[in-house]
Regions:
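A short, basic/flexible loop-to-alpha-helix module at the beginning of a structural domain
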Residues: 33-42
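Glycine-rich Rossmann-fold phosphate-binding loop(s) that bind the pyrophosphate
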Residues: 49-50
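N-terminal Rossmann-fold NAD(P) dinucleotide-binding loop
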Residues: 53-54
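Aromatic pocket-lining residues of Rossmann-like dinucleotide-binding sites
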Residues: 60
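Conserved N-terminal Rossmann-fold NAD(P) cofactor-binding segment
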Residues: 68, 72-110, 124
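Conserved NAD(P)H cofactor-binding loop of Rossmann-fold oxidoreductase domains
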Residues: 116-118
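Rossmann-like NAD(P)(H) cofactor-binding subdomain of soluble oxidoreductases
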Residues: 125-172
Length: 172
């Protein structure tokens, strides 16, 4: 079905998107007051904007599981690009404030998802991968804990058992 025209309209505090398809008008409305009540105070920080971090951030945004989503990465242009991609792809999903930033922006996060680390390279042993990713975890955890000490932390990086222990050990 061909898309003829689409218009965003803001009426009475809600966002409306009108699409005209074959002379029928479909309306998609989002009630901003209801959305605020459902997701009030849910701030999620994703450390690492690689494939895993970006996928998790996208899933959180399209499911409407948070009201604010922060992407932090050592490669700042990558984090900014992923945040912009998710914002642009989030037009028909529940509203979520998506942005990139740095550790101080993670203050008052309800959840921190840690996806930092490098992928296993050809010929690299699992022990070498463990050592490299443990060093990365040891550098990241003290910084994020300083700004989000009461957050729930979720480690999604390989090897997850060793890195979870390392996260607990270095965070105090």
């Amino acid at each position: 079905v061909p898309l003829r025209q689409g218009v965003f309209r803001r009426q009475n505090g809600s966002l409306s998107f009108c699409v005209r398809i074959k002379y029928k008008v479909l309306r998609f409305r989002r009630n901003s007051e209801v959305e605020k009540k459902l997701k009030k105070g849910k701030k999620v920080t994703v450390l690492g904007a690689g494939n895993v971090g970006a996928s998790i951030a996208f899933a959180l945004a399209i499911k409407g599981l948070c009201s604010e989503l922060l992407l932090i990465d050592i490669n700042k242009p990558k984090a900014k690009g992923e945040a912009m991609d998710i914002m642009q792809g989030n037009a028909f999903c529940p509203s979520c404030d998506i942005h990139d930033g740095d550790y101080p922006d993670a203050a008052d996060s309800d959840m921190v998802i840690i996806t930092v680390g490098i992928a296993r390279k050809p010929g690299q042993t699992r022990i070498d991968l463990c050592k490299t990713n443990a060093k990365i975890m040891a550098s990241v955890m003290p910084e994020i804990v300083k700004y989000a000490p009461h957050a729930c932390y979720l480690v999604v990086s390989n090897p997850v058992d060793v890195l979870t222990y390392e996260a607990i050990r270095v965070s105090g």
